[in-house]
Amino acid sequence: MVKKIGVLTSGGDAPGMNAAIRGVVRAALSAGLDVFGIEDGYLGLYENRMKKLDRYSVSDMINRGGTFLGSARFPEFRDPEVRKVALKNMHERGIDGLVVIGGDGSYAGADLLTKEGGIHCVGLPGTIDNDVAGTDYTIGFFTALETVVEAIDRLRDTSSSHQRISIVEVMGRYCGDLTLAAAIAGGCEFIAIPEVEFKRDDLVAEIKAGIAKGKKHAIVAITEKLDDIDSLAKYIEKETGRETRGTVLGHIQRGGAPVAYDRILASRMGAYAVDLLLQDHDYKKGGFCVGVQNEKMVHELISVCIAPENKKSKFKEDWYDTAKKLF
């Protein structure tokens, strides 16, 4: 059984990460474990920037966005020599367990620490993209969804006033879940996501069909990286004759106080991660990652969840079918 654990946040930040850290710290202290907070993810682990946390370290953190430990992208962690330094830093402090909050890249780093250094690592899915396998939802997804829907509502006000077409670019990397959920909740007329082949002419045809039915304005939700938004807006305006404007929501989607569901999910996952570390699991095959499936906490080997065939969450085809029916 572990006696000292570390906790870090890695990669892009997500609302609810502080709640997850709090869940880990409070659950670990209740079990008599020492907890170290590692600053700025794997970079801080390499630079030996760790601090012992107590109950008061996480007081008033559950409602705060971002991550008070800080986060960073640290591609140098792929270097085995860099990982050796990180492992040395943990071993010198007697840290034998680690909770990593982040996406699949963060999971990969945790798995290597387990396989190379014997550290018992558990990953928690912290990303607004909802693109991590092994879980129905990631920490931060529902807060980002609220942010996107609020933006869509505001754009609808001005689009309807000017009989304008608005294109909204939503984060998600190579996963369309955030765009899809926002399109349904925001009543978007059209949607473009990575899981479904996107062609400009098909989108224009749908918009023209809407205009023919008397539609005077429209909202198009599109996942980032699918097209250049300004160029697409000009193309739609040229083909339809309707004024068209693009809006890139950007990093505002990552900020803000986490909504209640994200706070609950993060707290449950944090406590569950500590339970895993306290149990007699076999870590010879690597670390574990936590998920929620049908509202129940589950875990799986990290190696399974980051395997190429499982590297992202399953496409919510039923959501897409629903969205299409409502256009």
Swiss-Prot record:
Q: Which family does it belong to?
A: Belongs to the phosphofructokinase type A (PFKA) family. ATP-dependent PFK group I subfamily. Prokaryotic clade 'B1' sub-subfamily.
- Name of the protein in its database record: ATP-dependent 6-phosphofructokinase
GO molecular function list:
6-phosphofructokinase activity; AMP binding; ATP binding; fructose-6-phosphate binding; identical protein binding; metal ion binding; monosaccharide binding
Taxonomic lineage is: Bacteria, Pseudomonadati, Pseudomonadota, Gammaproteobacteria, Enterobacterales
Tell me the Gene Ontology biological-process terms attached to this UniProt entry. canonical glycolysis; fructose 1,6-bisphosphate metabolic process; fructose 6-phosphate metabolic process
What residues does substrate bind to?
Answer: 127-129, 164, 171-173, 224, 245, 251-254
Pathway in which this enzyme or protein is active:
Carbohydrate degradation; glycolysis; D-glyceraldehyde 3-phosphate and glycerone phosphate from D-glucose: step 3/4
Requisite cofactors:
Mg(2+)
The organism encoding this protein is Yersinia pestis (strain Pestoides F)
Per the entry, what this protein does is:
Catalyzes the phosphorylation of D-fructose 6-phosphate to fructose 1,6-bisphosphate by ATP, the first committing step of glycolysis.
> Which UniProt keywords are present, listed alphabetically?
Allosteric enzyme, ATP-binding, Cytoplasm, Glycolysis, Kinase, Magnesium, Metal-binding, Nucleotide-binding, Transferase
